[in-house]
């Protein structure tokens, strides 16, 4: 895209360019993401489809096509941890200071039923798969998926293709087989796999009832759950077409006849994704890896976060069909949910945030009770870092339960939405109350400290996780940054609503430290570039002394942007912090933290490292089928490698956000354009990117010349 000097010409060209994008949407080639078959390692190597409730992963090999089908609302809601009066903040601080490890940990235990196997917590359930046997010697060779239409293809050795589509309108997945290729679907519920005998049967589950073949051309199964409404899967085939649907409720799946045909589902998919890309941000980068990371990642974000769908947890709707998903498939609020939803902001897909926000706000009675027991107030909200879709604490990790930045981060997300979308009514009716209640908990935690305020005790996420003494400390920089972000947002929100800000919020801004500061950062030898300047600590007196996957002590840089670079020695402190962080390296990193690192490099003005981090994320944490993993798939970048068993969507969505941040990034509230784009990128551009002031902008950098203009 060529930059034009005159704004009128630029606007016309952008309109034309948007039309071209909707038709072609090529990225750096034809826009299609490719797969080589066989893909038999695990389901996450497959092509991904979703309608925001049901997820389908298409994989397999030879003459066997596998459709792993999951649902984002498949919970066994039994168990969980209710907040107790003994889990009050004063008691926790006192026990920790006294070294009473067993007493403190005992506050956060519950008793599981006999034969339960593991902690007594809610968890997400697998649903099952449909296995399609191809006839006539057909062999799968490769697959493609177009992120701009949502349509996929599977290629056979003879050149024929199986077409794939999923519709958010019809809530159905469809296949169209080529002429002359016979196919035979078979239903395989999760209860037919080893997970049933090992984990589900001891917990009181019955086997799903399969009804394949009772009606010609139809099949599926229904599954009665011990404590939740039943689930079902059904498929119907006619001629060359086969349609798969899922649902919940007492009505048997046999009664659910798929009515849509492939043509309808195909056209609905194309129409939906055309609107999605027209409404949101688009980029052009000269790096084919990053172009694919953005295009396919934004597609998967849009697929799993439908405005009329179910809020996405760690894996969205893409759950394995033969095991219980890692970490219960829960909502992790100490970074993971935030990363999953981060593309909504710069990407301009604000409506995709609303199911998440409405779910959290529906928990307010429970969160208020949590705050009452945690710190003795009637007007607070306390959100544990790990919960199910009803806000029930998934317990066992005490530092996560008391991590109040989980609530503060979501409050800041809600206010960020208000700024981007201009939704003052939502601020007035819901968000402002949640922000105030969240701040009230912080205010109850604070204590006087020689004329300043302090947080007596708190966690820095995942720092020394199981170490009773070292996992928490005084004035965690992560908590300080979250508290300041919330205070500033509340002050701004009050102004927006025509109210006077609470004096206590102003006091937080004046007297609470922005971060815990070390006298110096030590490490390495003089010969190898020892870092000796001052920097940000994890806690008071505790610096970053090893590789760490949660860059929480730098949260005041990103995501909270609370550290003013021009204030006092802050610039030097940030330089020392960045140098020490670089020194500690990537040896204990996991997938979701690498895109965050890219954004931190962008913030520091290190464009080469920002881009390289995203390439490393793709190279080390994604499998051959572009599945996003928690642990490294390949050696050489980190020691956190346990194979391909843990898929999470946080890294993939955060990578999309990091690509946008290469081009549009805020420092001290001021937007910097192309800060993360290397000089050797001679032509790079973005379209329709959203800013916090409600504007949409497009821009380009051609041969070093930057031009940016408003879109609407």
What role is predicted for each listed range?
Residues 316-330, 378-428, 443-506, 707:
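The feature captures the catalytic groove of carbohydrate-active enzymes
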């Amino acid at each position: 895209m060529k930059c034009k000097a005159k704004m009128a010409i630029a606007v016309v060209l952008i309109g034309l360019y948007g039309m071209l994008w909707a038709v072609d949407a090529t990225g750096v080639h034809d826009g299609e993401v490719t797969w080589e078959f066989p893909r038999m390692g695990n389901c996450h190597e497959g092509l991904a489809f979703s309608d925001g409730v049901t997820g389908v992963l298409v994989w397999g090999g030879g003459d066997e096509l596998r459709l792993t089908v999951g649902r984002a609302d498949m919970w066994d809601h039994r168990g969980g941890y209710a907040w107790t009066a003994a889990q009050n903040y004063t008691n926790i601080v006192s026990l920790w200071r006294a070294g009473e490890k067993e007493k403190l940990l005992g506050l956060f235990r519950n008793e599981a039923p006999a034969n339960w196997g593991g902690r007594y917590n809610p968890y997400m359930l697998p649903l099952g798969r449909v296995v399609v046997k191809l006839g006539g010697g057909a062999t799968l060779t490769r697959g493609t998926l177009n992120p701009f239409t949502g349509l996929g293809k599977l290629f056979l050795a003879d050149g024929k293709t199986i077409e794939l589509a999923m519709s958010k309108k019809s809530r159905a997945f469809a296949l169209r087989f080529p002429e002359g290729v016979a196919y035979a679907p078979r239903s395989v519920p999760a209860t037919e796999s080893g997970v049933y005998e090992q984990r589900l049967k001891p917990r009181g589950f019955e086997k799903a009832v399969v009804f394949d073949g009772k009606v010609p051309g139809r099949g599926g199964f229904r599954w009665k759950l011990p404590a939740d409404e039943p689930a079902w899967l059904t498929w119907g085939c006619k001629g060359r077409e086969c349609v798969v649907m899922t649902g919940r409720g007492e009505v048997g799946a046999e009664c659910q006849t798929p009515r849509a045909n492939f043509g309808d589902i195909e056209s609905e998919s194309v129409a939906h994704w055309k609107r999605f890309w027209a409404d949101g941000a688009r980029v052009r980068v000269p790096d084919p890896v990053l172009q694919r990371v953005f295009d396919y990642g934004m597609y998967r974000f849009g697929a799993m976060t439908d405005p009329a769908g179910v809020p996405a947890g760690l894996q969205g709707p893409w759950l394995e069909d033969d095991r219980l998903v890692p970490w219960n498939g829960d909502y992790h609020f100490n970074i993971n949910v935030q990363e999953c939803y981060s593309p909504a902001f710069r990407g301009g897909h604000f409506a995709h945030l609303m199911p998440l926000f409405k779910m959290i706000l529906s928990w307010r009675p429970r969160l208020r009770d949590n705050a009452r027991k945690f710190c003795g107030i009637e007007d607070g909200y306390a959100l544990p870092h790990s919960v199910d879709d009803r806000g029930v604490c998934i317990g066992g990790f005490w530092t996560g339960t008391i991590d109040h930045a989980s609530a503060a981060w979501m409050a800041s997300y809600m206010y960020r939405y208000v700024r981007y979308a201009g939704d003052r009514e939502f601020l007035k009716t819901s968000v402002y109350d949640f922000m105030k209640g969240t701040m009230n908990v912080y205010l109850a935690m604070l204590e006087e400290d020689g004329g300043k305020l302090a947080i007596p005790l708190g966690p820095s996420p995942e720092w020394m996780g199981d170490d009773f003494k070292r996992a928490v400390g005084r004035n965690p920089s992560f908590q300080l940054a979250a508290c300041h972000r919330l205070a500033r947002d509340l002050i701004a929100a009050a102004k927006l609503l025509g109210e006077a800000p609470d004096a206590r919020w102003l006091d937080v801004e004046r007297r609470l430290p922005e971060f815990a500061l070390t006298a110096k950062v030590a490490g390495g030898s003089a010969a190898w570039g020892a870092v000796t300047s001052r920097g940000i600590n994890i806690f008071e007196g505790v610096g970053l002394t090893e590789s760490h996957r949660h860059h929480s002590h730098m949260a005041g840089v990103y995501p909270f942007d609370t550290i003013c670079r021009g204030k006092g020695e802050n610039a030097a402190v940030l330089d020392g912090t960045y140098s020490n962080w670089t020194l500690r390296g990537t040896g204990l990193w996991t997938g979701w933290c690498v895109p965050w690192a890219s954004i931190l490099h962008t913030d520091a003005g290190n464009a080469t490292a920002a881009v390289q981090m995203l390439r490393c994320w793709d190279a080390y944490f994604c499998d051959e089928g572009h599945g996003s993993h928690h642990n490294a798939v390949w050696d050489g970048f980190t020691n956190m490698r346990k194979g391909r068993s843990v898929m999470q969507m946080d890294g993939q969505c955060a990578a999309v956000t990091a690509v946008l941040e290469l081009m549009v990034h805020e420092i001290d509230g001021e937007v910097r354009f192309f800060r993360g784009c290397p000089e050797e990128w001679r032509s790079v551009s973005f379209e329709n990117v959203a800013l916090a002031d409600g504007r949409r902008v497009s821009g380009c950098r051609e041969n070093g010349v930057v031009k940016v203009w408003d879109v609407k």
